[in-house]
Amino acid sequence: METVLNSCEIRVLGCLVEKELATPEYYPLTLNALTAACNQKSNRDPVMALEDADVVRALDSLRMKGFARQSAEGVRAMKYCHCLAEKFLLEPPDLAVLAELLVRGPQTVGELRTRAERMRPFADLAAVEEVLRMLMEREEPLVTRLPRQPGRKEQRYAHLLAGAPEAEGEESMAPPEGARLQVRAENERVARLEEEVTALRAEVAELRRMMEEFRSQFE
């Protein structure tokens, strides 16, 4: 894919899609609800321990890339939702399979059918295979079939939103160049924001000092 997401963005996006389908009554999600969803112990691989700041950074990046947006429904608290359906013209069955791949990584057809049940029931394995076929045969594929692992009968499928997955057993000495550049850009952006906050705090402190001096002239 042209746009590559990092692991935190993948988890945030997957949780937004999952919660829309599994618990629509609580969707869109507040920051607290989204962070809790990202750090769930169940239905997650790997289990993560993200802070609110991590989720906010991921949301900002996803919004800039057109994968998520702030919901107008968030009156008292800011709420967030995904844009996958509009961005890629996906139907609920597509979203259910993709969400499962986003939050749990590569899986077999059987695993996807069982685990996606909480979001969208599939009549049989053929129904899941059809969704996977459509996601793979798009002009811009969203899913790929992985090579069969030694000793395993079934092949697994993986999403492509984080780029092409590494071959099984392959150890990467360094992250892909695209991901490395994204992380560097994100770190630089955060550093700039921190510098701006520091400068603003200094200005506020100086204004307070000047105000105190001004008041003291009339006491």
Swiss-Prot record:
Alphabetized SUPFAM superfamilies for the sequence: Winged helix' DNA-binding domain
Family (UniProt): Belongs to the UPF0502 family.
Organism: Geobacter metallireducens (strain ATCC 53774 / DSM 7210 / GS-15)
HAMAP family noted in UniProt: UPF0502
Record protein name field: UPF0502 protein Gmet_0262
